[in-house]
Amino acid sequence: MNKEKFTLIGAGLAGPLMASYLAKKGYFVEIFEQRPDMRKESISAGRSINLALSIRGINSLKEVGLYEKIKNHAIPMKGRMIHDLDGKTHLQPYGQKEDETIFSVSRGKLNMDLMTLAEKTGKVSIRFNHQLLSADLDQNELIFQLTDSSEEIKSSFSKVIGCDGSASILRKAIVNKTNANYIKKPLGHGYKELTIPPSKNEKFQIEPNALHIWPRGKYMLIALPNTDFSFTCTLFFPMTGETSFETVITEKDVLKLFQSQFPDTVKLMPTLVEDFQSNPTGDLASVYCEPWHFENKALLIGDAAHAVVPFFGQGMNASFQDCSVLNQLIGQYADDWTAIFNDFSTTQVENGHAIADMAIENYLEMRDHVNNPVSYTHLTLPTNREV
């Protein structure tokens, strides 16, 4: 029996992982990606350069045979290192077992490895520089614009899976066609990435095997280690208000904020002001959508279905779990795609909404529990809740 061909929108993290699962089951897959091939061109996605990989994501990478390779380039983080205002630190271990460790991984390297893994199956092709403009779910037709020439092309599909992120065009088509429930909830806070570089003798400046957190009430700073001995820091901060991205603008503003709220970081970040002023400010929002499919034709996974605030990697791990669950359902129902899509949408919607809620709760708890030492223990959540 000939296997149907799948069309996937988006070659970020979820897309090529799902393609590998499908290829292992004998399906041919064509992925359309709006960006150039990052393995050939240096591109910026405007997003975190490292992510926290936990048990949900680890299990998925094991299933496609990529975990050991990724682990070799990952840094284990055995707990949260809480930084008080006075410079004191408190390590909160995640646990004693190996699966209670999370890993700092490079988004870019992971993305490239996932694409290469998918292509090596011989059943997956990736068409870069193709931006989806619209989807006609009745006619099974997609319209793309070539980002390097502005030419528009049409492509037909049999089954299409949207892995195209929080601004998903396929989700828009499904919502319009099904009157699906859809809400995008802005958090009112944004984020900006900063850097703690290696020391002069090319070593880590702070403890590498921990996820560092500076909770400060209405805002917070976190830092994850990189394999080049640097740390990627993320400042979660109000978008508007008296102390916000709207008001912290000048060199004086930036230094005042960090010297008063994160004093132990200033000496570690020689390019603090430059990074703050030049790096983009990302917004924080959660996406709630239901259902995630249209008939047996179209399905959403990952951020396209359930975007969450970018907080300690829930998005990636939950997206990877989506791929694993869908793979299991394909095995369970064979080629009954109506049953597969229905079951996936029914079971995963609740999980997706729960993870989105949990991400916000974690963020609010972590940033607000600053002056209460008792709360630090309270915040040591089980690793299977994605930290």
Residue ranges of model-derived segments:
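Glycine-rich FAD cofactor-binding loop and adjacent beta-loop-alpha segment at the N-terminus
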Residues: 4-81, 98, 102-109, 158-159
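C-terminal helical "tail/cap" subdomain of flavin- and related membrane-associated enzymes
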Residues: 2-4, 328-381, 385
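A conserved FAD-binding loop/helix module that cradles the flavin
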Residues: 312-321
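Helix-loop-beta segment of a Rossmann-like dinucleotide-binding subdomain
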Residues: 88-105, 236
